Amino acid sequence: MARKSLIQRERKRDKLEQKYHLIRRSSKKQISKVPSLSDKWEIHGKLQSPPRNSAPIRLHRRCFLTGRPRANYRDFGLSGHVLREMVHACLLPGATRSSW
């Protein structure tokens, strides 16, 4: 289980990303439309003004049960070992164990 502080930090980053999403998107569109290099540098400076944790690249997908940051399945939102345990316990409808 991940430490609770790491999970809270991830939630904080998610809120910041949602807050500054429109500002980042509009700045990136302006950069692509402006022909002169000096104007692009000005807009690039504005793009760097929001906090670093508001960048979407800083977000990390975590298991919603354990908070584990690795081996996550997007379809379920679970890490690999939790997914395996839940499938074995028949807690995920439609998911079957592979056998050949």
Curated annotation (Swiss-Prot):
PANTHER family: 30S RIBOSOMAL PROTEIN S14 (PTHR19836), SMALL RIBOSOMAL SUBUNIT PROTEIN US14M (PTHR19836:SF19). The keyword Ribonucleoprotein applies. GO terms for cellular component: chloroplast; small ribosomal subunit. PROSITE patterns: RIBOSOMAL_S14 (PS00527). Transmembrane segments: none annotated. Part of the 30S ribosomal subunit. The keyword Membrane does not apply. GO terms for molecular function: rRNA binding; structural constituent of ribosome. SUPFAM superfamilies: Glucocorticoid receptor-like (DNA-binding domain) (SSF57716). It is found in: Plastid, Chloroplast. This is Small ribosomal subunit protein uS14c. Gene3D superfamilies: 1.10.287.1480. Binds 16S rRNA, required for the assembly of 30S particles. One of its GO terms (biological process) is translation. Its main location: plastid.
